[in-house]
């Protein structure tokens, strides 16, 4: 019974700590929007080079 107050205090302290990322952000971490921008840019380059739509094969014919 003597350990119960200590346990409760520890739980309250743990719950009140600020949440932080478990791992530091690295150079490889990219946002999802960045991937979408890269994909759009690559598709645009492919379309410009071939004069053909990459997504819609009907315009190539």
UniProtKB/Swiss-Prot annotation:
The modification Cysteine amide is found at residue 60. Expressed by the venom duct. GO terms for cellular component: extracellular region. GO terms for molecular function: toxin activity. Residues 1-22 form the signal peptide. Residues 23-48 form a propeptide. The keyword Signal applies. It is found in: Secreted. Keywords: Amidation, Cleavage on pair of basic residues, Disulfide bond, Secreted, Signal, Toxin. Contains 2 disulfide bonds that can be either 'C1-C3, C2-C4' or 'C1-C4, C2-C3', since these disulfide connectivities have been observed for conotoxins with cysteine framework V (for examples, see AC P0DQQ7 and AC P81755). Belongs to the conotoxin T superfamily. The cysteine framework is V (CC-CC). This is Conotoxin Tx-D021. It comes from Conus textile (Cloth-of-gold cone).
């Amino acid at each position: 019974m003597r350990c119960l107050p200590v346990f409760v205090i520890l739980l309250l302290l743990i719950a009140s700590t600020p949440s932080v990322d478990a791992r530091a952000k690295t150079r490889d971490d990219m946002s999802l929007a960045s991937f979408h921008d890269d994909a759009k840019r690559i598709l645009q380059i492919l379309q410009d080079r071939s004069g053909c739509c990459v997504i819609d094969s009907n315009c190539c014919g």
